[in-house]
């Protein structure tokens, strides 16, 4: 079933934007973590952990947030705002791998490797180092304007010499890694990653003015669009521009994509630490898109920004399925979304309105494809061809699968769900993943494209 659905999805033409970067990856071990703690002293690290810095301005901020992530075993991303710290990172770590990062870049490479009919990727910054991170596939294109016309080139032929490059440093950690923090011995409970995301003035999220008039043509050409990277917008810039300016432009982009035909747009949401900015992104963009994807921490952040602080706190503290379902219902109604997809370590969930053209069984198939693709990626580190989905098909569902289904049925009984289609599936969980980077993006891509493929088959696209 999964294979047939992927086959249908591969007939689609997709557009993805905006964020790409170079991911410099470090595979952490206990000794490296210990060395960092010893360099600053356990007491200083503990004090800074209590302060919980929201961004990285100096090395101790980094060490404190890293140790916190390792202790909880939760994947986290913290912005690096001090460009001068790049040299400190480069002197302290040897990068094990350099590869494509940023949601739009990861999604573009995935779709190209899965042999989708046509993949258009746009990022406002395309330096040579960045362009070389794209897979060399004939179905992958970058839109440029030449002679007043839209021209599609392969990304590695469209780079611009003087564009800035964004480097995100990713620290992959494994469950079972141990180190000492003063008198305490810490064992990492889950595998995950800690991302130090570069948030510098030079990197912006926008569409170049000369390409903007051609967005309706792109929207007409494709079956769907996946937009991401809004977490990279800053509240204020030194040149006088601010988040409001870039969000106004982002709204124009979505409306232009939808001008000639109402192309379905999925927004892949990522954690935004600043509450004010988070609120702006939600209120400006969510009402314009059809589908949103996020993880359970992100839905708590979103609910908190919408004023549902108690519910957000419950999701953060207890992680109960019924709270996530309740939060999802609130979000889909307040933002008038067609589809909300929430992915966690143990389950993936869809929430749609009852009048959605797809049945709950079809929505479930879409999620099955999503978790199978993610399991293939976790097992192999990347997906190089459509055949590799068979790897994910051999990965068992996680051990909490039955418990997840039970709690979901309880939640449905307890909450009013008649006006909704609610679907949940347990994830296929790889015990020792080669990499955890891009798994959420892979889930959202598999889910949204298979959703579109089934809509198309019903004549609803």
From Swiss-Prot:
Domain of life, per the record?
Answer: Archaea
The segment(s) forming the ADPK domain are: 1-457
Residues that, per the record, bind Mg(2+)? 268, 298, 441
As cofactor, the record names: Mg(2+)
Where in or outside the cell it occurs: the entry states: Cytoplasm
* Primary subcellular site in the record, as a coarse category: cytoplasm
Active site, per annotation: 441 (proton acceptor)
Checking Gene3D superfamilies in the record gives:
3.30.1110.20, 3.40.1190.20
According to its UniProt record, the EC number is: 2.7.1.146
Report the function annotation for this chain: Catalyzes the phosphorylation of fructose 6-phosphate to fructose 1,6-bisphosphate using ADP as the phosphate donor.
**Alphabetical list of NCBIfam families matching this protein:** P_fruct_ADP
The similarity annotation says:
Belongs to the carbohydrate kinase PfkC family.
For this entry, the protein name equals ADP-specific phosphofructokinase
Annotated organism of origin: Thermococcus kodakarensis (strain ATCC BAA-918 / JCM 12380 / KOD1)
Q: Which gene encodes it?
A: pfkC
């Amino acid at each position: 079933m999964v294979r047939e659905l992927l086959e249908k999805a591969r007939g689609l033409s997709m557009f993805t934007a905006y964020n790409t970067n170079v991911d410099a990856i470090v595979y952490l071990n206990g000794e490296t973590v210990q060395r960092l703690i010893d360099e600053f002293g356990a007491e200083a690290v503990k004090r800074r952990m209590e302060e919980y810095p929201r961004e990285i301005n100096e090395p101790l901020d980094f060490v404190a947030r890293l140790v916190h992530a390792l202790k909880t075993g939760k994947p986290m991303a913290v912005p690096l705002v001090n460009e001068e710290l790049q040299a400190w990172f480069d002197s302290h770590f040897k990068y094990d791998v350099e590869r494509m990062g940023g949601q739009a870049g990861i999604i573009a490479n995935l779709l190209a490797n899965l042999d989708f009919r046509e993949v258009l990727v746009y990022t406002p910054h395309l330096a040579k180092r960045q362009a070389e991170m794209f897979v060399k596939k004939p179905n992958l294109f970058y839109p440029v304007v030449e002679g007043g016309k839209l021209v599609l080139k392969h990304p590695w032929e469209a780079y611009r010499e003087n564009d800035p490059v964004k480097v995100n440093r990713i620290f992959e950690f494994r469950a079972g890694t141990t180190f000492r923090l003063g008198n305490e011995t810490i064992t990492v409970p889950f595998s995950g990653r800690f991302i130090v995301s570069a948030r510098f003035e030079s990197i912006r999220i926008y569409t170049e003015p000369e390409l903007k008039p051609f967005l309706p043509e792109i929207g007409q050409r494709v079956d769907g669009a996946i937009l991401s990277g809004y977490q990279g917008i800053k509240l204020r810039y030194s040149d006088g521009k601010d988040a409001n300016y870039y969000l106004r432009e982002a709204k124009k982009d979505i409306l232009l994509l939808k001008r000639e035909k109402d192309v379905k747009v999925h927004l892949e949401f990522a954690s935004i630490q600043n509450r004010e900015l988070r609120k702006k992104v939600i209120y400006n963009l969510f009402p314009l898109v059809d589908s949103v994807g996020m993880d359970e921490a992100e839905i708590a952040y979103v609910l908190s920004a919408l004023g549902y602080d108690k519910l957000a706190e419950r999701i953060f503290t207890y992680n109960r399925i019924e709270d996530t379902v309740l939060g999802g219902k609130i979000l889909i109604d307040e933002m008038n979304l067609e589809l909300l997809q929430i992915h966690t370590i143990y389950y993936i969930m869809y929430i749609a309105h009852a009048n959605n053209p797809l049945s709950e069984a079809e929505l479930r198939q879409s999620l099955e494809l999503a978790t199978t693709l993610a399991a293939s990626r976790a097992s192999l580190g990347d997906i190089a061809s459509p055949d590799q989905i068979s790897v994910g098909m051999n990965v068992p569902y996680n051990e909490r699968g039955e418990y997840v289904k039970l709690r979901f049925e309880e939640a449905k009984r307890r909450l009013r769900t008649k006006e909704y289609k609610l679907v949940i599936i347990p994830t296929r969980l790889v015990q020792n993943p080669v990499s955890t980077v891009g798994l959420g993006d892979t889930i959202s891509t598999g889910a949204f494209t298979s959703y579109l493929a089934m809509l198309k088959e019903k004549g609803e696209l």
